[in-house]
Each structure stands twice: as structure tokens, then as C-alpha cells.
């Protein structure tokens, strides 16, 4: 991926560094996935901006298909830990953990563009398949169940929805338009397009 460079007052910035000056952070790594590397970068940016001015708003733009639960929880915990208010804006998609991060913005400051798609589902194991002894698989299965319950609690807290409704809705991929995500409580407003 080529990252554009911006020249401002004889100083060159890559586009993301320039946007960081305006307290704008983008969620996602390669292909927009929330992975350990992208989470580390997002957490560092959140901590930096909070230390710089904990009363000024941070804008978190999300266009992500989701990713690793552990990486997403690291971002989520940081969002809840810092003092600065966080505006979340979905552009394109906020799927899986992307939807959790979207909902985790400061109340009244969670938005989506009109054509954005939001999706919640239960956590899943992805990769090269499951292998190992029965005991190892049971351990992983129990951890997955704990993650599922934890994510249901987080979504219930931020949406105001009943945990059992979220459990039922997220048994399979549950897709929403921006308006449907607003009705569900994942966002507060759908932003109008200027043109």
C-alpha cells in the first residue's frame, strides 16, 4: 500500500500522521482487520492524544471487517480507560469487532454514514483448522464461550439491548444498515451526506 505524503510548512507527513494532528485515527491494519499490529498502533495513538489533551475529542474512523477478539478488546479497554471523549464514525463497514468498537464510542457521539453496513455475530475460530487433544479443544471451546459472554455483556451495555436478544441476533451474521444500527443502539445518528 502506498501512503501519501503531505507537505505542510516545509514538513512532510504521511497522511495518517497528518490526520493524527487533527485527532483522527483510522481502525484496521492490512485489509482493515483488527489484528495485534493495528491494535498496538491504535492504542498508542489513543494514549498519545489523551496525554496531549484529555478533554479534546478523538475521532475514530472505522472501516473494518473485524478481526481478533484479543486485539479488539485491547483497543476497547483503552477506549474505556482514557479520559478524552471518543467519537466513532463508520465509513463503509463495521463488522464483527468493528461493530463493538463503533458502539464503544462516547454516548451521543457514535455515527455512521448512510451507506455503511454494520454486522454483529458470535466470536469464531478462524485459521488453519482445529487440532490437538480432546482436552486442548475443550479448553479452547471454553475460552470461546467466555469470549462470547463477555462480548454479549459489552454490546448490551453500549446498546441498551437485552443480552438475550443480542445472543439470539448474533447466532449468525446479523447485518444492519446505518438506520437499523441506530434503532439497535449501536450508533446515535446517521450522518447526512453534504453533496
UniProtKB/Swiss-Prot annotation:
Protein name (database record)? ATP-dependent Clp protease proteolytic subunit
State the encoding gene.
Answer: clpP
Q: What does this protein do?
A: Cleaves peptides in various proteins in a process that requires ATP hydrolysis. Has a chymotrypsin-like activity. Plays a major role in the degradation of misfolded proteins.
Q: Which Gene3D superfamilies match?
A: 2-enoyl-CoA Hydratase, Chain A, domain 1 (3.90.226.10)
What InterPro entries does the database record attribute to this sequence? ClpP, ClpP/crotonase-like_dom_sf, ClpP/TepA, ClpP_His_AS
Recorded hits in PANTHER family, A to Z, give:
ATP-DEPENDENT CLP PROTEASE PROTEOLYTIC SUBUNIT (PTHR10381), ATP-DEPENDENT CLP PROTEASE PROTEOLYTIC SUBUNIT, MITOCHONDRIAL (PTHR10381:SF11)
What is the disulfide pattern of this chain?
A: none
Q: Name one Pfam family in it.
A: CLP_protease
GO process terms (BP)? protein quality control for misfolded or incompletely synthesized proteins
Organism expressing this protein natively: Elusimicrobium minutum (strain Pei191)
The principal location of this protein is: cytoplasm
Which sites are catalytic? 96 (nucleophile), 121
> Which GO-annotated molecular functions does the record name?
ATP-dependent peptidase activity; ATPase binding; serine-type endopeptidase activity
Amino acid at each position: 500500500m502506498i501512503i501519501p505524503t503531505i507537505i505542510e510548512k516545509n514538513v512532510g507527513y504521511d497522511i495518517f500522521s497528518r490526520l493524527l494532528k487533527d485527532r483522527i485515527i483510522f481502525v484496521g491494519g492490512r485489509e482493515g482487520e483488527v489484528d495485534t499490529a493495528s491494535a498496538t498502533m491504535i492504542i498508542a495513538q489513543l494514549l498519545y492524544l489523551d496525554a496531549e489533551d484529555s478533554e479534546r475529542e478523538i475521532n475514530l474512523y472505522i472501516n473494518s471487517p473485524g478481526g481478533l477478539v484479543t486485539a479488539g478488546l485491547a483497543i476497547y479497554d483503552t477506549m474505556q480507560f482514557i479520559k478524552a471523549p471518543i467519537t466513532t464514525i463508520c465509513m463503509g463497514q463495521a463488522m464483527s469487532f468493528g461493530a463493538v468498537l463503533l458502539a464503544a464510542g462516547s454516548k451521543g457521539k457514535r455515527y455512521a454514514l448512510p451507506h455503511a453496513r454494520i454486522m454483529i455475530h458470535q466470536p469464531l475460530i478462524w485459521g488453519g483448522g482445529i487440532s490437538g487433544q480432546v482436552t486442548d479443544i475443550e479448553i479452547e471451546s471454553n475460552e470461546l464461550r467466555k469470549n462470547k459472554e463477555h462480548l454479549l455483556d459489552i454490546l448490551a451495555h453500549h446498546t441498551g439491548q437485552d443480552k438475550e436478544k443480542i445472543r439470539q441476533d448474533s447466532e449468525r451474521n446479523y447485518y444492519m444498515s446505518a438506520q437499523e444500527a441506530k434503532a439497535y443502539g449501536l450508533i446515535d445518528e446517521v450522518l447526512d451526506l453534504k453533496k
